[in-house]
Amino acid sequence: MTYYDFRNGLQRINSILYQEMDEEESRRIPSESQMTYSNGYTTWVSSIFVDIRNSTKLFANEDREMVTRVIRSFVSEVIEVLQSDDFDEIGIRGDCVYGIYSTPKIKDVIEVFNKATYINSLMGLLNRQYRKKNYPSLKVGIGLSVSEDFVVKVGRKGTGINDRVWIGRAVSEASNLSSYGNKSIYGPIVMSDNFHYNLIKYKDNGCKDEWFRYASINGKTVYHCNVTNSYFDDWIERNVRP
């Protein structure tokens, strides 16, 4: 039976709403041990979300073994690409895999973009393998965003149930943009205006203007592309038969 102590609940709500909060700036996303229920950190964050297109149809397929093998292989290899020394959080939300990174420098933002191009190439490898077993191919949308966000710890003190919440644009925007990738006019990779600006700010970073196409989503400027990792593509062509 559900039980909720109203009086204690009201006290907890008021303690959260009226307590003093310390806000600190940090070049890196703070560790779990640095976070409390009364502080928060402002830091530059980049986020990448990888969202499967038409996942409802896939999950409704009666061949559960096939669906399991496809999803497990997809999630496993996307996570492998997302891992790095600078990641703060890698997770799974339904049919979506995401990564959140400390990106205080432009080179860090470029590295997150590189992960997106690897994943775009990875889909070619996965789909070749799926076709060999007569499995359906996957398409994904990849959303990218960067912003100076505020990270706070939330949960219920004393229960061990807690997590960090990202207040700002990077996480929510990347999640939203991933839903547009590989749909309609959009390429697989869709990024925020600020993320794109960081990629092309310095011409010697390897990114080229002609890779990206301008678009507007709900009045906001975004850019999209279909860039892959050429080294990965070459390896696939040499080593994996179609």
What is each residue range found by the language model?
Residues 1-31, 182-242:
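Intrinsically disordered, glycine/charged-rich C-terminal tails and inter-domain linkers
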Residues 33-111:
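Catalytic NTP-binding/metal-coordinating core of nucleotidyl cyclase/transferase enzymes
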Residues 63, 92, 97-138, 144:
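Short helix/loop segment flanking the catalytic signature motif in cyclic-nucleotide metabolism enzymes
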Residues 70-74, 115, 119, 173:
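Hydrophobic alpha-helical membrane-association signature
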Residues 75, 79, 120-127, 178:
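Structural signal for well-ordered, non-membrane alpha-helices
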Residues 102-108, 142-162:
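Catalytic strand-loop-helix junctions within cyclic-nucleotide turnover domains
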Residues 145, 169-194:
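Catalytic/regulatory signature loops of cyclic-dinucleotide turnover enzymes
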Residues 153-178:
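Catalytic-core segments of nucleotide cyclases and related cyclic-nucleotide turnover enzymes
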